[in-house]
């Protein structure tokens, strides 16, 4: 996990942030939702996730979109929209930092790439590109082990709400990764060979972490 410490930190902070988002917004209990302490902890983890690497911004956005969609589906958005709004303040530090960098001409290419469509469009209709990306992302040995543990844990102890939450997070993250790799200005195989194993750490940790959490989870109703 820590072979590439920044990626290891992203994985840990993302897993922790996902747990905090789940227990504060998604879980059917008021125990965490009524305690300011958990919101402060969530703010610290959310903010740290965005500041470690640019990838963290997308990961936190995924958590917010997932929570929003699940609450919308359950028709509970009106009740929790204010909580999502307060938690979204955690984006403010990275927005201010990016604005500062932009004003100083630092890291301009990190978030503005005018050639994205130029590289993306020619690769969209080539099925081989999707096969290569799927091979590097989904057939990683550690990812498969973590996924199997996750599935077995939910087979042993089914939790529909938690499973749906992690499944949506996984799907959105995979779609973003496909977009990023298809739009890379570098050779696709070389890009995957040099970076795929690092980004998969986040998914591997997510599945392993929530597989273990599911097995030990006890609902608190007060």
Mark where each language-model region is.
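Membrane-lumen/periplasm interface segments of specific transmembrane helices
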Residues: 61, 69-73, 80-157, 170-178
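Membrane-interface alpha helices of multi-pass inner-membrane proteins
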Residues: 21, 37-54, 62-65, 92
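Membrane-interface transmembrane helices that cradle and orient dolichyl/undecaprenyl
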Residues: 17-38
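Hydrophobic/aromatic-rich transmembrane helices and adjacent perimembrane loops
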Residues: 6-13, 58-59, 190-215
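Hydrophobic transmembrane alpha-helices of multi-pass, membrane-embedded glycosylation machinery
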Residues: 18, 59-73, 215
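Transmembrane alpha-helix segments characteristic
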Residues: 41-42, 160-186
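Multi-pass, polyprenyl lipid-linked donor-dependent membrane glycosyltransferases
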Residues: 1-16, 20-21, 52
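Hydrophobic alpha-helical transmembrane segments
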Residues: 39-44, 57, 61, 83-88, ...
């Amino acid at each position: 996990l820590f072979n590439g410490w920044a990626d290891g930190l992203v994985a840990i902070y993302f897993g922790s942030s996902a747990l905090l988002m789940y227990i504060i917004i998604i879980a059917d209990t008021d125990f965490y939702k009524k305690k300011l302490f958990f919101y402060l902890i969530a703010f610290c983890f959310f903010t740290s996730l965005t500041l470690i690497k640019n990838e963290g911004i997308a990961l936190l956005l995924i958590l917010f979109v997932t929570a929003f969609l699940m609450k919308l589906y359950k028709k509970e958005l009106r009740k929790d929209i204010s909580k999502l709004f307060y938690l979204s303040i955690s984006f403010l530090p990275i927005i201010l930092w990016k604005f500062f960098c932009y004003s100083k001409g630092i890291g301009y290419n990190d978030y503005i790439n005018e050639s994205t469509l130029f590289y993306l469009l020619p690769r969209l209709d080539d099925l081989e590109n999707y096969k290569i990306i799927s091979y590097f992302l989904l057939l990683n040995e550690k990812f498969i082990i973590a996924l199997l543990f996750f599935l077995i844990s939910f087979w042993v102890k089914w939790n529909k709400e938690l499973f749906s939450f992690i499944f949506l997070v996984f799907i959105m993250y995979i779609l973003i990764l496909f977009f990023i790799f298809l739009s890379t200005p570098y050779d696709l195989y070389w890009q995957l060979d040099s970076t795929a194993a690092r980004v998969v750490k986040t998914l591997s940790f997510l599945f392993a972490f929530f597989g273990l959490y599911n097995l030990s989870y006890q609902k608190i109703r007060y």
